[in-house]
Amino acid sequence: MAQEQTQRAGGGEDDETTGGDGSAGQERREKLAAETDDLLDEIDDVLEENAEDFVRAYVQKGGQ
């Protein structure tokens, strides 16, 4: 069981060091960064329009 616990999940850097295509990894990182930025922008828009409703709903769901 101890051997199973030593295995890591993920490891984005390992892809490049094992001979993977570095440019493909870079493109994927850029795409994920752009998607993350888009999602954060969408969240900002919702908060700007309905901050009070958002906070009220969050607190009702058990947030602090």
Swiss-Prot record:
Write down what this protein is called: Prokaryotic ubiquitin-like protein Pup
Pathway per its UniProt entry is: Protein degradation; proteasomal Pup-dependent pathway
Q: Which gene encodes it?
A: pup
- What is known about its processing and modification? Is modified by deamidation of its C-terminal glutamine to glutamate by the deamidase Dop, a prerequisite to the subsequent pupylation process.
| Coiled-coil stretches noted in the UniProt entry, renumbered to this chain | 24-52
Q: Name one GO molecular function term.
A: proteasome binding
Record the organism: Rhodococcus erythropolis (strain PR4 / NBRC 100887)
Residue ranges of the region described as ARC ATPase binding: 21-58
Source taxon at top rank: Bacteria
Any single biological process term in GO: protein pupylation
Q: Anything noted about its domains?
A: The N-terminal unstructured half of Pup provides a signal required to initiate unfolding and degradation by the proteasome but is not needed for pupylation, while the C-terminal helical half of Pup interacts with ARC to target proteins to the proteasome.
What is the similarity comment for this entry? Belongs to the prokaryotic ubiquitin-like protein family.
